[in-house]
Amino acid sequence: MAAILLACGDTSQSTFDRIQALEKEAFVGDSLRADVRRQLMVSYADLAREQPEHPFVPEGLFRRADLLISAGKYEQAVLQLQDLHDGYPAYELRPRCAFLVAFIHDVHLRDPELARRAYERVIALHEGTPEAEMSAQSLRWLPQRP
């Protein structure tokens, strides 16, 4: 039985090890390697699925959302950020997740109505945070954007 367990290994730890190795080779100078970006997006999701209680999961999902944005996958990034915001209530970057949802709707997807609702949600849920202040500022500028 021990041989079977050793052969199978701890997949969540090996996934975390893979993430750490990939992060070390992700950049060539200032440029993110596209092949590593794809592998990291998959690995962050794998870790969350394999071991949702792992302490790195919220940060990994946040990094995955960032990679989705850099890949131009804005709708997927919005879903990832919403899931992270709603699924990890103790995550310290929740206000930033909510703000980024609004920002993506505003700047990348150019949907002023969804952006407005998302900015208002940040203000309501995260009062007193820098993200709430940025949301209020963004709302003031929203009607003036082309």
Indicate residue ranges for each PLM-predicted region.
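Acidic, polar-rich low-complexity tracts and alpha-helical solenoid repeat scaffolds
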Residues: 4-146
